[in-house]
């Protein structure tokens, strides 16, 4: 079952674009939770509709009561690359809000250079701490824009993703907008089975 993001957008408290990852974390952890991508009867969330959350059209019986059935019990603010690396190694991706923007063209190693800034949230989905490319830890960032960038890829990275260098990762994390989520009601933890040989 997929999650529906409209409730998170409704939690912003304003009708304009954008929000903070801190506000989103607070909603899924304290005042609401995660809504499911389905028809709730009084409101249909089976198909994404940005205006529902943006215009505060989700009734409280859904926005608060139904969402709280799938509340995130643990949220952690990540501020160091070591914390980000450890979270990813344990199967937790990060939601990172920052003003950092990156090139739409990856280099020969799948890395995107920092470019003009944008205020945006992106998922960090993997880490390469082998230090084989730039003698530093790299983080794999997945953007939500579909196949928006081009260039070589490495280690099976998905379309729309790019690796970032450690110095950029440190800068993004220093703003305090990076979060890891765990222990969600209704979604039991899954055992991760892998060996170091499967990673390389």
Give the positions of each predicted feature.
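Predominantly the structural core of cysteine protease catalytic domains
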Residues: 9-142, 147, 151-200
């Amino acid at each position: 079952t997929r999650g529906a993001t409209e409730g998170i957008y409704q939690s912003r408290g304003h009708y304009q674009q954008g929000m903070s990852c801190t506000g989103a974390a607070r909603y899924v952890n304290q005042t609401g939770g995660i809504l499911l991508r389905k028809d709730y009867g009084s409101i249909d969330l089976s198909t994404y509709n940005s205006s529902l959350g943006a215009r505060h059209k989700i009734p409280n019986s859904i926005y608060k009561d139904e969402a709280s059935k799938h509340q995130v019990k643990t949220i952690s603010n990540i501020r160091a690359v070591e914390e980000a690396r450890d979270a990813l190694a344990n199967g937790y991706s990060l939601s990172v809000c920052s003003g950092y923007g990156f090139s739409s063209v990856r280099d020969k190693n799948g890395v995107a250079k920092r470019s003009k800034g944008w205020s945006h949230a992106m998922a960090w989905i993997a880490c390469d701490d082998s230090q084989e490319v730039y003698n530093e830890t790299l983080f794999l960032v997945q953007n939500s824009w579909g196949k928006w960038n081009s260039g070589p890829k490495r280690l099976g990275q998905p379309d729309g993703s790019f690796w970032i260098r450690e110095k950029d990762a440190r800068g993004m994390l220093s703003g305090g907008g990076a979060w890891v989520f765990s222990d969600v009601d209704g979604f039991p933890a899954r055992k991760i089975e892998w060996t170091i040989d499967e990673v390389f």
